[in-house]
Regions:
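Gly/Pro/Ser/Thr-rich low-complexity, intrinsically disordered segments predominantly at protein N-termini
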Residues: 1-209
């Protein structure tokens, strides 16, 4: 994200009204706006692959898959973000125009310029959403998926997935081979070397508050 200098403080509603007049997308944090940068072709292809796989599944569950053009507002006063993909099954989001507020699952496809923010500050904001049950991080330079899930003790637990494994989204009872997410995605040989599935399974001990 790129901060916009000399931009006056805006409320969330002022941001909604201002952004529709702009030529690109902006995220809104603490009264300030940040221009969104474009993603790579692998980044876009991964998001499209996942969306295509999810859509038939969620349709029968009265849920919706939303693309990176849909904003997620953390509260009535912000912040507001554009995740790469979000899913809402909440009737309160049915009539949403500017942003949804009750997603159960959020996906970010990682890029070098935003990975640390997606893992840190942005995830901290997303955790404020009472409806959120899973936060998915997908690498765009190697076959790797990490899913943070809210457990029954209200702690966020990390489950990583590597090549050859089946990715599971428990909040919507969906699963698919991880390779489906990377279909027609060009990964360079040096970046696509993977840990074995057994090593990935052994690593599933991490948790985050």
């Amino acid at each position: 994200m790129i901060a916009i200098p000399d931009k006056p403080y805006m409320t969330l509603q002022e941001y909604f009204e201002w952004e529709v007049q702009q030529g690109c997308k902006y995220e809104y944090v603490n009264g300030e706006v940040y221009a969104m940068t474009g993603g790579t072709i692998p980044h876009s292809a991964i998001a499209v692959n996942l969306s295509a796989a999810l859509r038939p599944h969620v349709r029968s569950r009265s849920c919706r898959v939303l693309s990176s053009d849909a904003k997620v507002a953390i509260s009535e006063t912000g912040p507001s973000f554009y995740p790469d993909l979000s899913i809402t099954c909440d009737s309160r989001d049915r009539g949403a125009i500017d942003a949804i507020c009750h997603p159960c699952l959020i996906v970010e496809v990682l890029s070098p310029s935003t990975e640390s923010y997606d893992r840190g500050a942005k995830f901290a904001h997303y955790r404020r959403l009472e409806s959120l049950r899973e936060y998915v991080l997908i690498s765009s330079d190697r076959v790797n998926v990490e899913i943070f899930r809210l457990n029954e003790r209200h702690k966020w637990e990390l489950t990583p997935y590597a090549a050859g494994e089946t990715v599971q989204f428990t909040s919507i009872e969906f699963e698919c081979p991880i390779e489906l997410l990377y279909e027609d995605v060009d990964l360079s040989p040096q970046d696509s070397a993977q840990d074995s599935p057994q090593e990935s399974s052994d690593a599933r001990t991490s948790s985050q508050q």
